[in-house]
């Protein structure tokens, strides 16, 4: 394919006042690919709750505050329009569709990378955090690390899967839940949660209980959950006895779930979720609560000793899990629930997130 014409300037959305939800559309230079890099003309980018945490500086786990002028975003899909020196060795060609993930670059050499945990790379670069993100029309990516997008999978559908889809798929694998076993998805109607429900129920043969606000019930059940639990119907001052008893009653012999995936960023959800487990159960922590860190309120030593429960974390998937997630979508096993918006709408989207009103995902049309 002949090389397309590449402009000198591009549109991008920056965080103009980190600590708030304010964004601004600006004009930036189109970058030149370096050695082993490709230039990607992005057409779509998902908007993730992680972007919200980064732009508002409410993720206290991050080492540095976000700086004004940061281009956010880490769920970008587009076409390769230029190859840097050496990039052809990757097999990529002009016109290939690829995706840019949360971890935009991993070294491939450190101990985590060598163990297949490139999401924990010691030398990682995070798209949209001290690295230019995907809320722009052109971005650079390492030729060996961008994710191929399968033919037949629309770019807008692929975008949310590059973070949300990959993240929950990896967390489901870490839960070690087996086909036919019960799994609870906390935050089941959110951007991550509704994808976790689909992958669990339709891709892995798990029996799913979705937990979320009542307004999310239709989406959660449509995604494949057998049961839905409305958290607003239960008290919080009873040490979560009522809701945990109810969730357990939905499982085989009332023993509880084999696993829980906490997709929401709620400290209360973490305290509840640990109590949903049966003996030898596993809770996987995915959602990152904002502001000052808090311990899980129900994490008493006696609980771990008496029930042999396990708690683990899951950040993002590796490059192979990203490819596997795309294959799920290409086969129609999963489909993100999303709406499309223009770049100029990003501030309003973040306001929806701030108010807890957002269902599913939002994908930016970057044209």
Swiss-Prot record:
Keyword Metal-binding belongs to the record: yes
Cofactor(s) named in the record: Zn(2+)
A Gene Ontology BP annotation from the UniProt entry: alcohol metabolic process
Oligomer status and interactors: Homotetramer.
Record-listed Zn(2+) 1 binding positions: 48, 74, 163
Alphabetized Gene3D superfamilies for the sequence: Medium-chain alcohol dehydrogenases, catalytic domain, NAD(P)-binding Rossmann-like Domain
Localization annotation: Cytoplasm
Species of provenance: Emericella nidulans (strain FGSC A4 / ATCC 38163 / CBS 112.46 / NRRL 194 / M139) (Aspergillus nidulans)
Pfam family, one: ADH_N
Origin organism lineage: Eukaryota, Fungi, Dikarya, Ascomycota, Pezizomycotina
Keywords linked to the UniProt accession: Cytoplasm, Metal-binding, NAD, Oxidoreductase, Zinc
Keyword Zinc-finger in record: no
GO terms, molecular function: alcohol dehydrogenase (NAD+) activity; zinc ion binding
Swiss-Prot/TrEMBL catalytic activity: a primary alcohol + NAD(+) = an aldehyde + NADH + H(+); a secondary alcohol + NAD(+) = a ketone + NADH + H(+)
Cofactor binding: number and manner: Binds 2 Zn(2+) ions per subunit.
Annotated residues for binding of NAD(+): 187-193, 212, 216, 286-288, 361
Superkingdom of origin organism: Eukaryota
SUPFAM superfamilies to which the protein is assigned, alphabetical: GroES-like, NAD(P)-binding Rossmann-fold domains
The enzyme's E.C. designation: 1.1.1.1
Binding site for Zn(2+) 2: 107, 110, 113, 121
This protein's name: Alcohol dehydrogenase 2
């Amino acid at each position: 394919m002949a090389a397309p014409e590449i402009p000198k300037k591009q549109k991008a959305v920056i965080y103009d006042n980190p600590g708030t939800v304010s964004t601004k559309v600006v004009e930036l230079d189109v970058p030149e690919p370096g050695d082993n890099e490709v230039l990607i003309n992005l057409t779509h980018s998902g908007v993730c709750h992680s972007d919200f945490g980064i732009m508002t500086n409410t993720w206290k786990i991050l080492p540095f505050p976000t700086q004004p002028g940061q281009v956010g975003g880490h769920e970008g899909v587009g076409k390769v329009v230029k190859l840097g020196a050496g990039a052809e060795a990757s097999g990529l060609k002009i016109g290939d569709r690829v995706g840019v993930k949360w971890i935009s670059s991993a070294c491939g050499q450190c101990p985590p990378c060598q163990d297949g945990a490139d999401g924990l790379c010691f030398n990682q670069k995070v798209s949209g955090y001290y690295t230019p993100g995907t809320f722009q029309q052109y971005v650079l990516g390492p030729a060996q690390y961008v994710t191929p997008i399968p033919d037949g999978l629309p770019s807008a559908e692929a975008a949310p899967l590059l973070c949300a889809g990959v993240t929950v798929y990896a967390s489901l694998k870490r839960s070690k839940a087996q086909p036919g076993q019960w799994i609870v998805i906390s935050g089941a109607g959110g951007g991550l949660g509704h994808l976790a429900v689909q992958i669990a129920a339709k891709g892995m043969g798990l029996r799913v209980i979705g937990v979320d606000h009542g307004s999310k019930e239709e989406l959660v059940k449509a995604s494949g959950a057998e049961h839905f639990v409305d958290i607003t119907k239960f008290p919080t001052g009873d040490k979560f006895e009522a809701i945990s008893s109810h969730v357990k009653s939905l499982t085989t012999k009332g023993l509880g779930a084999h696993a829980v995936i906490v997709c929401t960023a709620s400290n209360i959800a973490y305290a509840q979720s640990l109590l949903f487990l049966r003996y030898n159960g596993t809770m996987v922590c995915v959602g990152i609560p904002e502001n000052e860190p808090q311990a899980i309120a129900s994490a008493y030593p006696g609980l771990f000793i008496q029930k042999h429960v396990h708690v683990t974390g899951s950040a993002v998937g590796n490059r192979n899990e990203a490819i596997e997630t795309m294959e799920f979508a290409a086969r129609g096993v999963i489909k993100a629930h999303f709406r499309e918006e223009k770049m100029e709408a990003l501030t309003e989207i973040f306001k929806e997130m701030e108010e807890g009103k957002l269902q599913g995902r939002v994908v930016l049309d970057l044209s």
